[in-house]
Regions:
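Alpha-helical scaffolding segments of alpha/beta enzyme cores, especially the outer helices
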Residues: 42-46, 70-78, 104-115, 135, ...
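Substrate-binding clefts and catalytic carboxylate motifs of secreted carbohydrate-active enzymes
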Residues: 225, 246, 264-268, 276-277, ...
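Acidic-and-aromatic substrate-binding clefts and catalytic sites of carbohydrate-active enzymes
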Residues: 32-38, 58-69, 90-104, 128-132, ...
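Acidic/histidine-rich catalytic cores of soluble enzymes
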Residues: 54-55, 151-238
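H/E-rich (His + Asp/Glu) clusters that bind or coordinate divalent metals
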Residues: 237-244, 251-259
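N-terminal pre-domain/capping segments
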Residues: 1-119, 213, 276-286
Length: 286
């Protein structure tokens, strides 16, 4: 699935002054989901050894990869990693009692996020049954405002992570417009997935300008030059990230996450290629 993102790059407040003093490149752990399922501690050590400094979590269900918040935080510390963000679901699917979602157990999710040092929580994906009409999106927007208020009290910023379906007309309207216009900008910002934005035929930089300062997080993943527009390693595809990175200040971006939902071989090999391109080519454009 595409609802988790990868690799995080931290930009401190110096970005507002045009400089970047602290560079920590991170990774969205969904990219290495099979490795995390088998050996989370070992996988995190390998990630750190590649030069990553941050990770973005996924799959929280009351625990982080089977660990309570305190244990997971200890593992991160041992590996020299921090987790500034994590992915969560809305929760209006199945039996509608899905722990760690906006609609069920949100307060605990926020408390656990704070306990491990997260400063962002991102709504990763809307299930098809959650988004059948514009009325659904209006209800989601209202619920995101409430969830964002809970986050704010804990010193955490709520974000919404897009795919391409939010840009497809529904009931004569564009769902992304509803999510943007009917949420409080102070309570709900965006984690813009630049792959899905591009696949939807939108220009990321135009969105940065339209929602200036509100796109706090990016998902950086590349698209190959085939009719299917598949995922590929960053720097191996057709998305002009050198151009995009030059507009980080307009976006308001604080972290970016390199992601590859599907890899041709070992995911660890793919993220190794991606971080090399980020280090050699993209950072200088910030």
């Amino acid at each position: 699935m595409a609802w988790v993102a990868a690799g995080s790059f931290f930009i401190n407040d110096a970005l507002a002054l045009g400089g970047v003093k602290d560079k920590k490149i991170g990774v969205q752990l969904y990219t290495v989901r099979d490795d995390m399922a088998k050996d989370p501690r070992g996988t995190l050590k390998k990630i750190a050894a590649m030069g990553f400094g941050e990770v973005e979590n996924f799959g929280y269900n009351g625990k982080f990869f089977g660990m309570e918040a305190s244990e997971y935080k200890q593992v991160l510390d041992e590996c020299g990693l921090v987790a500034p963000s994590g992915h969560y679901l809305y929760g209006n699917f199945g039996n509608k009692q899905n722990p760690g979602t906006v609609l069920f157990g949100w307060e605990k999710a926020v408390a656990d996020a704070k306990a491990i040092g997260q400063t962002y929580m991102a709504i990763a994906f809307l299930m098809p049954e959650e988004r059948t009409s514009i009325a659904d999106y209006k209800k989601i927007a209202a619920d995101l405002n409430k969830a964002g208020a809970v986050c704010k009290k804990a010193g955490i910023q709520l974000c919404y992570h897009n795919h391409d379906f939010e840009f497809q007309e529904l009931d004569g309207q564009i769902p992304f417009d509803i999510l943007a216009n009917e949420t409080d900008p102070a309570l709900v910002k965006f984690e813009l997935d630049l792959f899905w934005v591009s696949k939807a035929g939108k220009d990321p930089i135009a969105l940065f300008k339209q929602y200036k300062g509100r796109v706090a997080l990016w998902h950086v993943k590349d698209m190959d030059n085939t009719p299917n527009k598949n995922f590929t390693e960053v720097g191996s595809g057709v998305i002009d990230y050198a151009r995009i990175f030059k507009h980080a200040k307009t976006s308001g971006m604080k972290h970016f996450f390199v992601e590859q939902d599907v890899c041709p071989g070992a995911p660890l090999d793919s993220i190794r290629k991606s971080i090399a391109h980020v280090q050699s080519t993209l950072l200088k454009n910030l």
